[in-house]
Design a protein with these regions (language model features):
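Aliphatic-rich helix starts adjacent to a transmembrane/signal segment
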Residues: 2-53
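Flexible, low-complexity segments enriched in proline/glycine/serine and punctuated by aromatic residues
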Residues: 16, 40-45, 49-176
Length: 176
């Protein structure tokens, strides 16, 4: 009895190996796509955190503006870049606390529009005290709390077939 060799079996093994290898590559590509989307969302959250911290530092530096509620803000329409230049540059050194607060808010809105897609912002500060101007300058930091909310459109979390963006929000309650 003669044993006949089976022809073409090696080619079938190679085709199965190529199929398994290509499925593995497609899985790796999907993993890479999810990683890029997640990394972008984390980057946007980091930008919002840095911008919020920067605004809180500006508020702490302008104690009178903070006590006089000059930093309260609500934007309803998404901010677009470039924003209009601040009304006052405060370069002459003759700015009031309200001028400094107005400039701080204008610069902050410009930064939001530059670094986040379709952002809106809200700052609301509330205190239970109403001290005099001299007391404001000598008292410890602001006695109330401020709430800051930054929202932006995050297109990285939406299915690719839709044109809508998911709204992401950064909320922070702090004492300046």
């Amino acid at each position: 009895m003669q044993i006949r060799s089976i022809r073409g079996f090696t080619l079938l093994e190679v085709l199965v190996a190529v199929l398994i290898f290509s499925l593995g590559l497609m899985g790796l590509a999907g993993l890479l796509a999810v990683s890029v989307k997640t990394n972008h969302a984390a980057y946007m959250r980091t930008q919002a955190t840095f911008l919020a911290q920067g605004m809180a530092d500006r508020m702490r530096a302008n104690v009178l503006g903070l006590w006089k509620n000059s930093y309260n803000l609500t934007t309803t329409a998404p901010l677009v870049f470039p924003q209009a230049a601040p009304a006052t540059t405060c370069s002459s050194g003759s700015c009031t606390y309200a001028d400094v607060a107005t400039r701080d808010l204008a610069v902050w809105q410009q930064q939001l529009a530059q670094f986040l897609p379709s952002p809106t912002a809200m700052i609301a500060c509330a205190t239970t005290q109403t001290p005099t101007t001299d007391q404001m300058l000598s008292l410890p930091p602001y006695s109330g709390t401020c709430e800051m909310q930054i929202t932006w459109g995050d297109v990285s979390n939406v299915a690719s077939k839709t044109n809508n963006s998911e709204t992401v929000s950064f909320d922070w309650v702090f004492q300046p």
